[in-house]
């Protein structure tokens, strides 16, 4: 998506899509209580979006958790720390705020609502901001959604030492439905456990999401990105989580399932012209 095509998204539309994504993740049991967070970056500024009408409290000069110079002049929406993602659809302004990034990227004007249900943005805001900045810097994306969630089957597999690698996790989740390789041709990059919100996790996530749309934070959750829509990012999670569900169920039944063979997956990839090096 080019930068010229992003400003047609109205503020109401952006908040509605964030809310819909939160509900879908909740239905997947991937965001228990206040877990999980969502951000969206767009090229539009406060005036184009009408931020002051929906989020009337402006806090200029708010320091960002890291410098994001590529985002200067852009707006980043982000969910609040401790907010339940399932509540966003019914009360978006209470659970989502927006930052319009200043020149230089060290600060921004933070737009909030008087009835906000949080004190600060999500504790993972550093990773969200870093991914947005890196993707804009490298690919000039005009719109991007980034989501962190904790899908139970994927997380469960990441607790298993013999599965906790990029090669093995992808082998396990790709073999249950032919659609999965089509939807996730690069698979999931698997990271070792790192402290949530840490500098190490942020840097590793930025690197992983350059070549993948989804990264596994072992024993914690996933982060996924989309250039089109928050729900498109959730779709990727749903495909991966379904594969993980089948794998867990197969393990519970003694590994009786054959799954889609590597040769069969290669045939699918050829038929749909899927560019992948996983097979």
Kindly give the residue locations of the regions a language model identified:
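Glycine-rich flexible loops
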Residues: 1-279
């Amino acid at each position: 998506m080019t930068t010229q095509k992003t400003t047609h998204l109205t503020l109401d539309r952006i908040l509605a899509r964030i809310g819909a994504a939160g509900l879908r993740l909740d239905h997947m049991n991937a965001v228990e209580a206040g877990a999980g967070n969502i951000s969206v970056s767009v090229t539009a500024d406060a005036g184009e979006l009408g931020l002051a009408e929906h989020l009337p409290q402006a806090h200029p000069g708010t320091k960002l958790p890291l410098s994001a110079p590529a985002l200067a002049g852009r707006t980043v929406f982000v969910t609040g720390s401790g907010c339940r993602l399932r509540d966003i659809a019914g009360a978006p302004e209470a659970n989502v705020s927006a930052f319009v990034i200043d020149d230089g990227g060290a600060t921004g004007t933070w737009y909030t609502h008087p009835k906000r249900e949080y004190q600060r943005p999500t504790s993972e805001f550093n990773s969200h901001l870093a991914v947005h900045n890196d993707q804009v810097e490298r690919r000039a994306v005009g719109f991007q959604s980034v989501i962190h969630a904790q899908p139970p089957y994927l997380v469960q597999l990441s607790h298993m030492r013999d599965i906790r690698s990029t090669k093995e996790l992808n082998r396990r989740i790709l073999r249950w439905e032919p659609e999965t390789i089509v939807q996730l041709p690069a698979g999931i990059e698997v990271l070792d456990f790192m402290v949530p919100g840490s500098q190490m996790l942020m840097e590793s996530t930025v690197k992983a999401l350059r070549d993948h749309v989804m990264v596994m934070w072992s024993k914690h959750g996933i982060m996924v990105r989309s250039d089109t829509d928050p729900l498109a990012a959730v779709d990727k999670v749903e495909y991966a989580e379904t594969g993980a569900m089948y794998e867990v169920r197969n393990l519970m039944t003694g590994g009786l399932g054959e799954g889609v063979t590597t040769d069969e997956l290669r045939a699918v990839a050829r038929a749909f012209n899927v560019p992948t090096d996983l097979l």
